[in-house]
Amino acid sequence: MRVLKFGGTSVANAERFLRVADIMESNARQGQVATVLSAPAKITNHLVAMIDKTVAGQDILPNMSDAERIFADLLSGLAQALPGFEYDRLKGVVDQEFAQLKQVLHGVSLLGQCPDSVNAAIICRGEKLSIAIMEGVFRAKGYPVTVINPVEKLLAQGHYLESTVDIAESTLRIAAAAIPADHIVLMAGFTAGNDKGELVVLGRNGSDYSAAVLAACLRADCCEIWTDVDGVYTCDPRTVPDARLLKSMSYQEAMELSYFGAKVLHPRTITPIAQFQIPCLIKNTSNPQAPGTLIGKDSTDADMPVKGITNLNNMAMINVSGPGMKGMVGMAARVFAVMSRAGISVVLITQSSSEYSISFCVPQGELQRARRALEEEFYLELKDGVLDPLDVMERLAIISVVGDGMRTLRGISARFFSALARANINIVAIAQGSSERSISVVVSNDSATTGVRVSHQMLFNTDQVIEVFVIGVGGVGGALIEQIYRQQPWLKQKHIDLRVCGIANSRVMLTNVHGIALDSWRDALAGAQEPFNLGRLIRLVKEYHLLNPVIVDCTSSQAVADQYVDFLADGFHVVTPNKKANTSSMNYYQQLRAAAAGSHRKFLYDTNVGAGLPVIENLQNLLNAGDELVRFSGILSGSLSFIFGKLDEGLSLSAATLQARANGYTEPDPRDDLSGMDVARKLLILAREAGYKLELSDIEVEPVLPPSFDASGDVDTFLARLPELDKEFARNVANAAEQGKVLRYVGLIDEGRCKVRIEAVDGNDPLYKVKNGENALAFYSRYYQPLPLVLRGYGAGNDVTAAGVFADLLRTLSWKLGV
């Protein structure tokens, strides 16, 4: 015997009704089947609305008409599709039910209220009609059918609207019916009868509970819950799109997940099947070939110690505390007895080890009743100061991680808390059951979605996300986007979902949180209408709960650099080749580091010095290992490396400068390079990394051009005048050559002083052979002397700089992946 249950969406129309019948028929070929049906989708909601509107004296006609139309369409669709379907008889059954419903509602209107017994009789009519219609379908197919009347066969105790079935007595009643083995068995869900023979209903998710009870009474081989999803997922797929379908889970895991908010099954449904060790299979009516999720005594997913993450929103926390709590026997019992008498469900409890306080969560809607009840119960204690005034926190959510394997595997809690910390989510309270099967945290309501997503990513090792917003799409920015596009196959292989969610130039921006199509981004940006707005990017992160957003600033803008602290505080990592932020005031420099540390975000700028060379990272690694910078010398400008290299080869200063400009090494105005300020900025960054608290004005800069030279006018005028310096530079080059040296434009750090100047270096110096646009950096430290640590390579160019930015992007994942 198998018990099947189909929910409201599964019987919403004629097509789905017949699909359910086909599933039942297929199962019946393998053995006897008993089926529990819900009301067609929306019917119960209409019935509840009719009760509420009738009591309030409002018009119920729209709800009544919609409900009648749903059944009319259902019957006509079945009549057209199924030969032999008794349309006229069943239409009469439906019409009679609605006629009775109208009479009952008229009585409610006269009374001005709806007694619970009447309410129960009204809201279960949809299930009753579903069974009548399904019986008609199988009689048309030629099957013998037995309909179990749940009011007669299921004995329930409790309230009219929330009863619990006595399985032992109900088993005897159903057995007495002696159902033939070849019959299709049908029973309306949600409904039972009390010891007076009155109709009662089984509360929320009552049809699932009905199916579990029937399976227990029949000692079924399996209870199948057919719904509109493929099974139980590790998380709500609407919150986490890459949630994984579970093959199996234990009764205890299912109970914990459902208690803490999973929507597939209600905790009451699990109790009967767990008591009688009946496997429960969750299946999709629209996708019957999917394997579904099997709930049983043990889980077969041994490789998944955590089975799911859930959240309960709209909670409030009440803290009862005070000096009188410590050592006072029975205080906790009084607190929860008050909640019980008030009919308020306590969802989560924590108590301090000092016994000074006890905290618990209740639904937000129950908060005021809970507070009043506690204040009445503890009036004297509050008045005398034995208890402190009740402390209440509102708009909270509970995030729970559930899995049998948590008992034996170390580190689950650490990873859970680490994920929340990385997302800047503050934990209000923590609770763990003695079974170690679940751990729950209380957070703010606004943080719940982000908390669930980041926890799922950490615990289930799904694709790691980087959501990139590129500002500035000139040389480096454009090259970066092209590299990201080309590297997508490699990224997918590494399970990295790197999506470009925003592209902006100085005028407009293009955004798509699901990822911009990178094969046509230039055309899309050209047609973009949305003005560039940094505030809009911040709002996107909060609105869509992005997990790992990264601002990539590929501009040279001071205005954008001034926003980095705000970006970090709002949850972005910041990756940039823009040197403006790191060479602003020392105060802003320190604010950036504090903002990054305080928000658990990364500020990465390895391309500030040396473009794609790993300069900053290597220097930081040295210093973190306890090394100390003693001295530094380096060629930090690709353009000046090229120019001074050409001087060695006999070119004049003016010719070398023109050639460097033609090859794209210099800025459009070469005076920007020849001033030495770009080198000074890079040197300041290195000095600050080494721990020196310096400003840009502290750098001693000797420009390439002597002070006596008139460098005024436009670019063409300047370049026309530049040959005036050729003889002087040729003489300096010759003098250096006589000593076996060459001229290099060098940045120096020595004893806390920073200098930028032309230096003559000999063949033993690591800078001697550096030319053609290369950078070279020589770090003399306590560990590296007398021979320095030398980094050498091309330190300019869009592609190498973009590659360095790409590497920094991947470092935003370093807390989760070894990349």
From Swiss-Prot:
Residues 250-470 are annotated as: Interface. Residues 320-394, 401-478 form the ACT domain. NADP(+) binds at V476, R507, T555, K579, G664, E667, G797. Residues 471-819 are annotated as: Homoserine dehydrogenase. One of its GO terms (biological process) is threonine biosynthetic process. GO terms for molecular function: aspartate kinase activity; ATP binding; homoserine dehydrogenase activity; metal ion binding; NAD+ binding; NADP binding. Keywords: Allosteric enzyme, Amino-acid biosynthesis, ATP-binding, Kinase, Lysine biosynthesis, Metal-binding, Methionine biosynthesis, Multifunctional enzyme, NAD, NADP, Nucleotide-binding, Oxidoreductase, Repeat, Sodium, Threonine biosynthesis, Transferase. The enzyme activities are regulated allosterically by L-threonine. NAD(+) binds at V473, G475, V476, A504, T555, G797. Pathway: Amino-acid biosynthesis; L-lysine biosynthesis via DAP pathway; (S)-tetrahydrodipicolinate from L-aspartate: step 1/4; Amino-acid biosynthesis; L-methionine biosynthesis via de novo pathway; L-homoserine from L-aspartate: step 1/3; Amino-acid biosynthesis; L-methionine biosynthesis via de novo pathway; L-homoserine from L-aspartate: step 3/3; Amino-acid biosynthesis; L-threonine biosynthesis; L-threonine from L-aspartate: step 1/5. Pfam families: AA_kinase, ACT_9, Homoserine_dh, NAD_binding_3. L-homoserine binds at E667, D678. Its cofactor is a metal cation. The active site is at K682. Na(+) binds at D606, V609, A611, L613. Residues 1-249 are annotated as: Aspartokinase. It catalyses: L-homoserine + NADP(+) = L-aspartate 4-semialdehyde + NADPH + H(+); L-homoserine + NAD(+) = L-aspartate 4-semialdehyde + NADH + H(+); L-aspartate + ATP = 4-phospho-L-aspartate + ADP. Bifunctional aspartate kinase and homoserine dehydrogenase that catalyzes the first and the third steps toward the synthesis of lysine, methionine and threonine from aspartate. PANTHER family: HOMOSERINE DEHYDROGENASE (PTHR43070:SF3), PTHR43070. Homotetramer. NCBIfam families: asp_kinases, PRK09436.1. This is Bifunctional aspartokinase/homoserine dehydrogenase 1. It comes from Serratia marcescens. The gene is thrA.
